[in-house]
């Protein structure tokens, strides 16, 4: 269901941001953006993953 996230989703997004986004959206553009941001810096990847999962 879009717009909802439980504690496990958020925890996975903090530990490994691309995995959290992949589990929620699959291999779409959200995943690739998160992967790129995680490679550029771990914190931007976390911020984007939490944003994408909770929006």
UniProtKB/Swiss-Prot annotation:
An annotated GO cellular component: membrane
Induction: Early induction by low temperature and abscisic acid (ABA). Late induction by drought and salt stresses.
Compartment annotation: Membrane
Keyword Transmembrane helix: yes
Tissue expression from the record: Expressed in shoot and root of cold stressed seedlings.
PROSITE patterns linked: UPF0057 (PS01309)
Residues making up the signal peptide according to the UniProt record: none
Gene: LTI6B
Protein's name in the database: Hydrophobic protein LTI6B
Function per UniProt: Plays a role in the regulation of membrane potential. Could mediate a proton leak.
Segments crossing the lipid bilayer: 8-28, 31-51
Classification of source organism: Eukaryota, Viridiplantae, Streptophyta, Embryophyta, Tracheophyta
UniProt keyword annotations, A-Z: Membrane, Transmembrane, Transmembrane helix
Membrane topology, as annotated: Multi-pass membrane protein
Keyword check for Cell wall biogenesis/degradation: no
Family: Belongs to the UPF0057 (PMP3) family.
């Amino acid at each position: 269901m879009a717009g909802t996230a439980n504690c496990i989703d958020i925890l996975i997004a903090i530990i490994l941001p691309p995995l959290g986004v992949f589990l929620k959206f699959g291999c779409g553009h959200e995943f690739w953006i998160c992967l790129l941001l995680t490679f550029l810096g771990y914190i931007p990847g976390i911020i984007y993953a939490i944003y994408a999962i909770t929006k």
